[in-house]
């Protein structure tokens, strides 16, 4: 607020105090940081699909997905009557707002909104059951002004391939996931099948890294313009620099090498757009162990012992 008041821009603002709720997102200060939750939306989703809030003696569900879904053209028809599209859209808003650990599970059920089958319905119910057991949780933000932009990017190479569905081209596609952080706070998450079919793990990882940096470079430009207009909008770390974390050595080598290699010249030029930012030092590509790769949570269904630590590192619980 003070930054805008001290600027030379003609912006009229009113101070209405601390922000406690916005678009159904509740915000609360805790000893851990700023907690963002959507209890009303979660309750609405559970009521829509008919999931009881009482777990009873049933075991706690610790992950929102257990497998990769397919088209399942010959599968059984849906049994329940709730609106599949409506529920998936609510889940999508939840995942993109305060529950980014759901992003893989929600993304894959969203692929089958036109003709969902019983297997897809069961996957949605799995997400909702997981939400029942974690309905009071959200995203905890712990700002750190010493950190600028950071990107965690990961890909699952042809993770949906299945010999029973080999005729479906989508099973050969890899999945991209990336998380963009600013000041140690998650500001954007993305999980989606890649549009092209990658020919190797390295290519899938490089495409993912390129897509992630395309998004963050736009944000970097915006913050640079904002800092130029508002003198007091300054941070210890330059706003127009970014550190990207990647766990594939081949993708790192391609990203940090100035010239194209014979083995990688087939990769579309659109995926090399960020190299000049690397060469000028605006973007740094850093190696990270797979166990610490936060984006892994959005590429595939994970077992609890892998999922839970990544969730804690990503959103604080």
Regions found by a protein language model. Give the residues of each.
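Divalent metal-binding acidic/histidine catalytic loops
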Residues: 39-317
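Polymerase palm active-site segment centered on the conserved acidic dipeptide of motif C
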Residues: 1-42, 47-49, 132-134, 142, ...
């Amino acid at each position: 607020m003070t930054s805008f008041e001290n600027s030379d821009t003609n912006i009229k603002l009113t101070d209405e105090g601390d922000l406690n709720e916005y678009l159904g997102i509740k915000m609360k200060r805790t000893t851990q940081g700023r907690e963002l939750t959507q209890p009303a939306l979660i309750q609405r989703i559970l009521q829509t699909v008919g999931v009881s809030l009482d777990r009873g003696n049933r075991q706690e569900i610790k992950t929102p997905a257990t497998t990769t879904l397919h088209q399942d053209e010959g599968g059984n028809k849906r049994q329940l009557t709730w609106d599949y599209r409506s529920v998936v859209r609510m889940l999508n808003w939840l995942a993109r707002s305060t529950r980014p650990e759901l992003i893989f599970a929600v993304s894959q059920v969203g692929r089958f909104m036109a003709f969902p089958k019983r297997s897809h319905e069961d996957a949605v119910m799995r997400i909702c059951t997981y939400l029942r057991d974690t309905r009071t949780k959200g995203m905890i933000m712990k700002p750190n002004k010493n950190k600028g932009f950071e990107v965690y990017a990961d890909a699952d190479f042809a993770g949906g391939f299945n010999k029973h569905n080999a005729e479906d081209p989508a099973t050969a596609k890899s999945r991209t996931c990336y998380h963009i952080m600013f000041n140690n706070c998650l500001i954007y998450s993305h999980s989606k099948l890649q549009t092209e079919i990658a020919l190797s793990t390295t290519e899938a990882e490089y495409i993912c890294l390129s897509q992630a940096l395309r998004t963050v470079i736009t944000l970097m430009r915006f913050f640079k313009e904002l800092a130029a207009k508002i003198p007091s909008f300054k941070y210890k770390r330059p706003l127009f620099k970014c550190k990207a974390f990647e766990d594939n050595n081949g993708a790192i080598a391609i990203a940090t090498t100035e010239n194209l290699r014979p083995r990688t010249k087939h990769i579309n030029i659109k995926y090399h757009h960020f190299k000049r930012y690397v060469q000028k030092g605006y973007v740094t590509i850093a190696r990270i162990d797979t166990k610490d790769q936060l984006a892994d949570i959005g590429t595939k269904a994970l077992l609890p012992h892998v999922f839970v630590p990544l969730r804690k590192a990503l959103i604080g619980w």
